[in-house]
């Protein structure tokens, strides 16, 4: 994708507070994100670059932390975590879920994409759940480029992170 440019635009329309209309639209906000996973020669994750459109970045440091936390959480979903159930009851203990340890976390490069003048609360469109949505797909795509094997279930199998 290097050297390519992508463009998209969305404007959420809401009704003013106190508007006398049936079923008023009080808020609407959409976030957009993209992530890229870079593997090293051994197939371990070296870096994840995560670009997120947040509208107005009210607290950039907090946004970076939210992006990093969402990436780490989703890395666990993608690579190591299992939550087995037996008749709808969890069978794993916390220590056996496969949560990533701090020394397993790669470099995460958060990129905050701002668009000024949005007609939403303070111009901010949020940075919650979306931080963990693109990660697993980005990791699966990186492994596909790495070894040509399509992986379609989580946690991804046949990676250096796969539990024996």
Question: Where do the language-model regions lie?
Answer:
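C-terminal catalytic domains of large/alpha subunits in multi-subunit enzymes
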Residues: 1-164
